[in-house]
């Protein structure tokens, strides 16, 4: 990626100096040409102008020619390979649900930095890069490590995330310092009216939505009915875990099938499926 380095020295004791030291010594920022280069220059450029809290100034979004699938894949691989505490790698695509659950490591160290199969999520990234503007993304459910929020922040000006676990949100904010201008986190149950109202205040519309919260059939339908109106024409609504139905555990596929057949609204919804694994999968449609 091409970028213009900022060579202006920052005093060692300044906020900029401290952040530069953090970037240089952070164990999981390994790709210097992409992460340290781009983000450190963004940080120092902003902090040269004003000594502000980093959370209020710096967007992770890749701009212009840098916003391509190769750079996003490289950054996401770095996220997975060098996460500070979650070392479970990508979700495996070649195992079935029963085997996955039997061998699941519930510890922090065993967590997947992003709860996705690589081939599936990168195919969705390709679709998004080709079809949507990259203005605003809304996701219902952020996962244990916030990997999907991190991914969308590379691609969109604004990312609004709703999750029921406040501790996960606060941990992500503490560890990764997302820009408050780019990232909005809403804590609560997505189906509650006050949470839906808060999402509506955060953004009146979006060009991408991922529904990946409670995986019960009724909850998925409620999330879809509550939030689908936010997605503008030409935008994309995606669902995660759409291959396998496991009663009481994975019921997203049942709703997606009903939506596709017309059983939900009376009109069939043309659905595209990214199914490159045994039990995970992503399905989406264009509004």
Please provide the spans of the model-predicted regions.
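A short alpha-helical cap/connector motif
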Residues: 1-210, 214-287
């Amino acid at each position: 990626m091409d970028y213009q380095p900022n060579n202006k020295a920052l005093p060692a004791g300044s906020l900029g100096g401290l952040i530069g030291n953090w970037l240089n010594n952070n164990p999981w920022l390994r790709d210097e040409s992409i992460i340290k280069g781009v983000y450190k220059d963004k940080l120092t450029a902003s902090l040269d102008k004003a000594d502000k809290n980093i959370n209020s100034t710096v967007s992770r979004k890749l701009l212009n020619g840098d916003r391509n699938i190769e750079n996003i894949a490289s950054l996401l691989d770095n996220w997975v390979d060098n996460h500070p505490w979650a070392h479970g790698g990508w979700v495996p695509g070649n195992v079935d649900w029963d085997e996955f659950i039997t061998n699941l490591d519930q510890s922090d160290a065993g967590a997947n930095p992003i709860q996705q199969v690589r081939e599936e999520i990168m195919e969705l990234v390709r679709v998004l890069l080709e079809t949507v503007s990259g203005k605003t993304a809304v996701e219902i459910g952020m996962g244990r490590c916030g990997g999907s929020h991190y991914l969308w922040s590379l691609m969109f000006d604004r990312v609004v995330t709703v999750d029921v676990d406040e501790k996960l949100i606060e941990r992500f904010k503490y560890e990764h310092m997302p820009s408050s201008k780019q990232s909005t986190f809403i804590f609560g149950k997505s189906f509650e009216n006050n949470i839906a109202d808060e999402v509506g205040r955060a953004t009146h519309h979006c060009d991408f939505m991922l529904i990946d919260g409670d995986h019960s059939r009724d909850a998925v339908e409620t999330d879809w009915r509550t939030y689908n109106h936010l997605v503008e024409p030409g935008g994309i609504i995606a669902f995660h875990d759409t291959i396998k139905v496991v009663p009481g555990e994975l019921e997203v596929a049942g709703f997606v099938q009903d939506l596709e057949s017309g059983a939900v609204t009376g009109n069939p919804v043309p659905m595209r499926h990214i199914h490159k694994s045994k039990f995970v999968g992503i399905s989406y449609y264009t509004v």
